[in-house]
Amino acid sequence: MSEQIFEKLKELLSTQNADFRAVSHASAKTSAEVAVARGTELGQGAKALVCVVKGGGAKRYVLAVLPADYKADLQLITQALGGTRASLASPDEVMRLTDCVFGSVPPFSFHEELELIADPSLLTRYAELAFNAGLLDRSIILNTKDYERIARPRLVKFAMAE
């Protein structure tokens, strides 16, 4: 768990004049539980999945961000990135690329090997996004337009309503 990532995010958002607030809450195991703890809607949650896309003898890492009430279609990620197969990264790969444990990964990439993509639905449904910020008991609630402006994710349609 990464206090450093939490502080790095707060510093980035502050220097970029983002409209955000940090929230402390009890650790939660699911997106639904953390939404209740934050006092936000489930769909406001920005779920960040570290994926491995293989193909053509290469391996790429992708941070795929989608609404917490949607599920990721790994085949669509594979197609969009020109791979032959995509899977979720191992816990060790997640830690190496994000400095975070699974479940606490924020929707920002601070690693050169980790390409950031987001499903367009993430940016259109709510005025604010909520996400774990490097720690399972801390979240940031951020203006959606500020997220798009600062993170600048590549938009890829890969999420489906559950």
Task: Show where each model-derived region lies.
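Extended, low-hydrophobicity, polar/charged segments
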Residues: M1-E162
